[in-house]
Structure formats: structure tokens, C-alpha cells
Amino acid sequence: MAMVTDGIDPMSLKHDEADSKENITFKDFYPGAIATIKDVKRWKNSKHAEQWTSTIETYAVPILGQLRVKDITRGDILEVLKPIWTEKPETASRLRGRLESLFSQAIAEELIQTNPATWKDGLAFFLPPISKVHEVKHHEAMPLEILKSFAPETAKKTSVVSRAVLFGILTATRVQEFLCARWDEIDIQRATWTIPASRMKCGLEHRVPLSRQALAVLERCERKSELVFPAPRSDKEMVIDSPRAFIRKATGESFTMHGFRSTFRDWCEENFIHEALAERALAHVKGDKVVQAYQRSDLLEQRRPLMQSWADTIMPKKK
């Protein structure tokens, strides 16, 4: 009655609220949905909500953010998942599950009638099972438990290629990035390695915080060349297949340097490392050139404890 007295039509207000709810975008919907799911499921670990939010913000919002929840289709979900389904199967699988939960919440709130992120009778017709993806990736990504033995054993070797491989693992960098590392790119005092844009896949300069273990590798390297890891019998760059050959000889398996980056990424995921830090550590820059230009902070200092923790995990201090 008070609203009528104030000149407000309650029926009109109710209609406006319903219209606003019906037209809600994914970007406006998902924070509240995550909060509701958190409360209903009584999550005890606050990091679960942070991880959900981080994953959704990184992978889903750029594509789904401005779409109305009711307009999102299976095709939109596939656009989100396909780019990472084989490259980051663990992340992709978790993301799909989280999206399915969010859209189930949307159904419960009567925003939609069908769930575009369901697996059975839905996405399963367009994406291979994660188990099959893992079978392929298993041959290239060394499991963490094996890496915990491989890294310390590699540290005992004295060849240039063994040091290059270990440095690459500790810094989670690509083969062409660490094989061509030069001494003038490395600041020992600041424990920072600056890779020039010309050698980066993303075309942007990348600063890498160096852990104690990574610095120890550099201390054992001879400075006979401008290159940190020159070819054994020359001052030229090492053959790009040298690390793979070394790993195969040492393990008898077809593990690759790229696989170590996958192992690092899975470790980040399992330890609730914020998505932005993990992606920056791997020099995965999102968005077009304009978006990249506005991402001024490379989170160097925030990444420093991350890389030290990674190094301590695979090469713990001797007691």
C-alpha cells in the first residue's frame, strides 16, 4: 500500500524485476550463482570459491560474459572449451563441470530450461573423453612423482644439456626460450631472467623470477659464451631436439619439455594457485594486442614465491 501511496505501481515494479532477471548476462549472473552454490554445499575451504571464480573469469567470461544467460547455447560452451580441451585437460574438465553447475543453478532459478554444459547427450558428441585425452598426454607430461626423482638426478649431471633441461623445468619455460638464454638477460642480484619479446611466442617481453635452485644451476654453468647453454663443441645454440633426446635417454620414455609445462600447470591447479599467476608464469597472455597493452603488471613479485614453491616441490632441500 505504501508503494501505491508513493506513486509506485507494485505490479509494474514486479514486472521490471522479472524482466531484469530474464535479461541478466552471464557476467552478472555467475558471482551470485557461485555464492549460492558455496552456501548450499557448505564449502569449508574458501579457496574453492576463489578457484571457481578464477577459472570462470579466465576462460568463460571473455566469451560468455556479455551474453544473456538464456541465450547461451551448447555452441558457445564449445567455443569456451575447445581451445583448452587437449592442451589443459584437467582445467577444461573442471571448467565444464563448474559451468554445468552454474547453468543448473540457472535452471533452478527459472532463467533457462535446459543446460548447455551437460556432458551426456550433449558435449560428449563434440569432445573426446578426458580419459582419452590423458592417454595421449601421458606420453609427453612426466607425472609429478616421477619428476621429483628425475629433477634431483638431473641436477647431479654435469653436461650442458642436463643443466639446460633442469633450468627449463624450474622456470617452466619453452625450449626455444631457455636454450637461447643469454647471460646479459639474467640479473643474478635480482634473481630475474628477462626474455626478449623476439623469442617469446606471445611476442611480449617475459620476466622470470629465479628460484634458489634455478640460480644454483646458473652458478654451475661456465661463462665461455654469450649463451648460457651453448652447444657442447661450439659457441652456437644447442640443437632444439637435444633436451628431448636427453630425457628419452635418461628415462626411456617420450616425455617432452612441453610436458613439464603441463605438469607445472596441473600442480598449480591442484594447489589452488590463482589462475592469473599460473598463466603469467607460463607466459600465456590473454586477449588481443589492445587488451595485452593494458595488462601492465606482469605480477613478477607475486610469481616469485610461486616459482620457489614449485622448485621446492620437485627439488626439496636436503635435510
At which residue positions do the language-model features occur?
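Catalytic-site neighborhood detector that most strongly recognizes the C-terminal catalytic loop/helix
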Residues: T194-G203, L215, S234-D235, L282-P316
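Short, polar N-cap/turn motifs at the start of nucleic acid-interacting alpha helices
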Residues: E185-T192, S254, I273-A293, P316-K319
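Basic, Lys/Arg- and aromatic-enriched nucleic-acid-binding interface segment
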Residues: D19, V40, I84-E100, A108-V175, ...
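Active-site/catalytic core of tyrosine-dependent DNA strand-transfer enzymes
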Residues: A141-K148, R190, R199, P209-G259, ...
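Hydrophobic (often cysteine-bearing) scaffold residues that line and stabilize catalytic clefts
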Residues: E22, F26, Y30, N45-H48, ...
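Extended, non-catalytic subsegments within catalytic or DNA/protein-binding/adaptor domains
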Residues: N23-F26, S54, G65, K70, ...
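Basic/aromatic-enriched alpha-helical hairpins
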Residues: T5-S12, E22-T86, L102-Q105
